[in-house]
């Protein structure tokens, strides 16, 4: 096989339908839109979700729940992620961000959770610490300071 013998797979190249280019093209005059009516007009058609006047699905289904504006949002970090730091390191949200343990600090700060094991002696200064995480940090000789 030579380069000049290469051909696209059958059916992969389809000719564009050129409409409104004369009667003999087969797609002239009404340009495949039929006669008059909503669908023949420019911009014709219905908006998304319109169901011909019957009550749309989005309005038939009951409303549920609400957005709690007082919800606390923390960036969560498990103690196993703190194992990478050296003994006596002061762990702050800024340090976690700088060391790429977390990708961003949420509006209410950082919360340390208790998954995994911790053997290093660390000083942890964050906004919130779970009970399990506090026990693991203190068991390894570290300190927890809630800021």
UniProtKB/Swiss-Prot annotation:
The entry's keywords: Ribonucleoprotein, Ribosomal protein, RNA-binding, rRNA-binding
Highest taxon listed in the record's lineage: Bacteria
Keyword rRNA-binding listed: yes
Biased composition regions of type Gly residues, renumbered to the chain: 42-52
Gene Ontology CC, one term: cytosolic large ribosomal subunit
GO molecular function: rRNA binding; structural constituent of ribosome
Region (Disordered), start-end ranges: 1-59
GO biological processes: translation
NCBIfam families: rplO_bact
Description of how the protein assembles with itself and partners: Part of the 50S ribosomal subunit.
Family recorded in the similarity comment: Belongs to the universal ribosomal protein uL15 family.
Function field: Binds to the 23S rRNA.
Name of this protein: Large ribosomal subunit protein uL15
Organism: Caldicellulosiruptor bescii (strain ATCC BAA-1888 / DSM 6725 / KCTC 15123 / Z-1320)
Taxonomic lineage of the native organism: Bacteria, Bacillati, Bacillota, Bacillota incertae sedis, Caldicellulosiruptorales
Gene name of this polypeptide: rplO
């Amino acid at each position: 096989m030579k380069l000049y013998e290469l051909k696209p797979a059958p059916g992969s190249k389809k000719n564009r339908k050129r409409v409104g280019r004369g009667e003999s093209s087969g797609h002239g005059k009404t340009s495949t839109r039929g006669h008059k009516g909503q669908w023949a007009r420019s911009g014709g058609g219905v908006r998304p979700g319109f169901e011909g006047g019957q009550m749309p699905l989005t309005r038939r289904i009951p409303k549920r729940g609400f957005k709690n504006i007082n919800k606390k949002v923390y960036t969560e970090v498990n103690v196993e992620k703190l194992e990478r730091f050296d003994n006596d390191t002061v762990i702050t949200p800024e340090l976690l961000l700088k060391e790429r343990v977390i990708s961003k600090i949420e509006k209410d700060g950082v919360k340390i959770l208790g998954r995994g094991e911790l053997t290093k002696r660390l000083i942890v200064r964050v906004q919130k610490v779970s009970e399990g995480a506090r026990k693991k940090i203190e068991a390894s000789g570290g300190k927890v300071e809630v800021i």
